[in-house]
Amino acid sequence: MKIEEYLQTLPKNLLSGEDVQLPEKTLKEIFKFSNLGKNDIFFHLGCNNEKGIEIAINEFKVKKAIGIDNNLEKIQNAQKNIKEKNIDVKLIHQNIEESDISDATVILFWFTDEKTIKSMVKKFNKLKPETKIITIWGPLPNYLPDKVNFPYIINKVPFKKAESVQEQLLS
């Protein structure tokens, strides 16, 4: 079976990432890899629930942690959980393409939709120098990664253009 055929057998919400939640162990690995710390303003785009921002604030002591997701039910459930746990984080119900991420220093961005990626790369390019964009499985299209611990990848603003897909993959 070809990979394309296999992918067609998977549920659309799984492929889109809509129903995928990163395990806590994975989130912690990603945060260690990115050197997330007390001076960071962390954004989890497509957060799904409060786990990522909860770990960022409680264990990595970030200055600020914000989760954004377009699924109202998931955000409301996450808000209920953080209120019960008395955690000082922010959850926003919004399309990430419309969100204000201008004060971010570290962003976790794991999307597969090409339109969303293209739109967000434009936003990312306007962020402060040294802002880290963390992706999983692949770097931002057409840019060289700054740091790789596969499957985790970091691109830093300003992005470095790749001359070819081969250069991007070999970096």
Name every feature range the model reports, one short phrase each:
Residues 78-79:
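Conserved SAM-binding loop
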Residues 71:
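Conserved SAM/SAH-binding beta-strand->alpha-helix loop
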Residues 115-171:
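C-terminal substrate-binding/active-site "lid" region of AdoMet-derived donor-dependent transferases
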Residues 39-48:
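Conserved class I S-adenosyl-L-methionine
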Residues 50-62:
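Conserved SAM-binding loop of SAM-dependent methyltransferases across substrates and taxa
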Residues 1-37:
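S-adenosyl-L-methionine
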Residues 85-96:
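Conserved SAM-binding strand-loop segment of SAM-dependent methyltransferases
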Residues 105-118:
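A short SAM/SAH-binding and catalytic strip from SAM-dependent methyltransferases
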